[in-house]
UniProtKB/Swiss-Prot annotation:
Subcellular location: Cytoplasm
Function as written in the Swiss-Prot or TrEMBL entry: Catalyzes the reversible interconversion of serine and glycine with tetrahydrofolate (THF) serving as the one-carbon carrier. This reaction serves as the major source of one-carbon groups required for the biosynthesis of purines, thymidylate, methionine, and other important biomolecules. Also exhibits THF-independent aldolase activity toward beta-hydroxyamino acids, producing glycine and aldehydes, via a retro-aldol mechanism.
Pathway connected to this protein: One-carbon metabolism; tetrahydrofolate interconversion; Amino-acid biosynthesis; glycine biosynthesis; glycine from L-serine: step 1/1
This protein's name: Serine hydroxymethyltransferase
This protein's encoding gene: glyA
Amino acid sequence: MNFEHISREDNEIYALIEKELERQQNGIELIASENVASEAVMEAMGSYLTNKYAEGYPGKRYYGGCYVVDGVEEIARERAKELFGAEHANVQPHSGSQANMAVYFTILEHGDTVLGMDLSHGGHLTHGSPVNFSGKLFNFVSYGVDKDTEEINYDVVRELAIKHKPKLIVAGASAYSRIIDFKKFREICDEIGAYLMVDMAHIAGLVAAELHPSPVPYADFVTSTTHKTLRGPRGGLILCKEKYAKDLDKNIFPGMQGGPLMHIIAAKAVCFKEALDPSFKEYMARVVENCKELGEQLVKRGFKLVSNGTDNHLILVDLNNKDITGKDAEKLLDEVGITLNKNTVPNETRSPFVTSGVRIGTAAITTRGFERRDMEEIADIINETIINRDKDLEQYKQRVEALCEKYPLYK
């Protein structure tokens, strides 16, 4: 990218931008919620569209001069609908959390009961955590994973639904490595007369590539981010049935947000177009292939995977048998250039600031070009770094850099 002007006008920030590029280039990015956006997406984010205020929706703005950005938003909405087979799309949410909030405000009243996945079992803050707005404004009841299989037990979900009679059931997760059966969730919702919202932020790319069953035919509302497996800009997306469109849209604007970020909406449109290309399906297939292989290689080295494997882009590693916490593993591996995040595991005994596990994803490294054969080396570096954590780690840092040199970023 061309940084001619910022390098001249603000060298302090420019230096940090270059430093971050160096960090990304020389490190292996395994955070499951991160990816590498294309230069086309980034060009849209840095475009002249950032100058335009456009409160409202296409054809009904509160500012003049919106006829160009109206076209941008229309394209983004139509591409999102085409990509996921949805009746309606709202591309204005600034984040996934705001997308979830908008759905809640569309169909819930303060204090209504909602059934969502427990954060410590793989859910998300906005699925009812008591420290989040969702847990403060609504009466969330949590479901988790089975103690033995570490997968969702739909019979237990049904029992909880019948007992608590939630107005809404939230399906979806931030750290769950198995296929989610949206049809079963729909059946449970129909049995008790509840709405179904699916948060597919993590698996949106897999859904687009038809590598995970789509929630769209079953859910009343589907929310997502656009920057994880979709490889787009940081932002949110909501899909819904047409009958909810009007109420949903007014809960985004004027309910929660003012002016939409038109440069980000343009970048969303670009990423939707990229995801509609046949090459995107090939990319997502490689993401899953790499994740499965990395998981298998870690198991060979004595690591315990939650649910014993993966069906998607991430694995959750239980470190209880490795005599190291998630917090310490995250810090240790960062020292050699491998970035991942500490994560709670089912039946967690440690605090969320320490944790007994780590979450690993392969979306970003697959975008860079990492192949299945590289997963053995990554697993080996992770294992040996943890084993030899009290020794000099320079050799592992060099091995990471050698791998990264094979797959340059933005070159």
